[in-house]
Amino acid sequence: SYIEAIGGREKLSMVKSIIERSEASMQGATIEVISQKNNKRQAITELKMMGNVMQKQVVNKDKAFMEMQGQKIDFEGQTLKDMIQIAALFPELNFDLNSVEFKGIVDVDDKKAYEIKISETKSNFYDTSTFYKIQTIQTQEIMGNSQTSTVKFGDFKQVNGIYFPHTTTLSMGPQAIDFKSTGIELNTTIDASLFE
């Protein structure tokens, strides 16, 4: 299974926090993404360009919001549920097997993958040979508009005995952005005020 493939339940349950940093280039500018999560259902993802925070997504237990260009948007409904789920350090540890649905084996680029529908708006895809999660497809309602995003994961490497993807490709519509990991830290203390 995926949990065993990336390190095993025992190792994963010892992780208290994850800080991930990655970078991408878009139209000549460098985009930096900093994601910080703890084991209390709190997570923050900041998107920075030239040192300035362009967008911020925060999950704080049972609430989630996005800040963009000075505007704060609270997430609701299924999008809120999905945000809370992915705020977990390793969401797969918490899956309710009665509520996920196996959809079949599909092609993801040049790989065969198991498609698992985990909610009304989100599916995960796991490589049939390695069991790594190689893709997610999610539909979000933002300000009345429905947006579908595809995230692909690759270049899996160990950090403290746990495998993490070190490349991530985010696609929304015709645009795709390739992010490369610049650092992953486990069990670093995260300032609780970030989630307010």
Regions found by a protein language model. Give the residues of each.
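Gly/Pro-enriched, hydrophobic low-complexity segments
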Residues: K112-E196
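Flexible, processing/modification-adjacent segments and terminal tails
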Residues: N60-K122, Q140-T148, L194-E196
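Short beta-strand segments
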Residues: A29-V33, Q55-Q57, I73, K122, ...
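Generic beta-strand structural signal
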Residues: K37-N38, V58-V59, D107, Y126, ...
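Structural motif
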Residues: M26, M49, M68, V108-D109, ...
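N-terminal mature ectodomain segment of secretory-pathway/periplasmic proteins
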Residues: E4-Q71, V100-E101
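Short, hydrophobic/aromatic-rich segments at coil-to-beta transitions
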Residues: M14-R21, N39-E46, V108-I116, Y132-Q135, ...
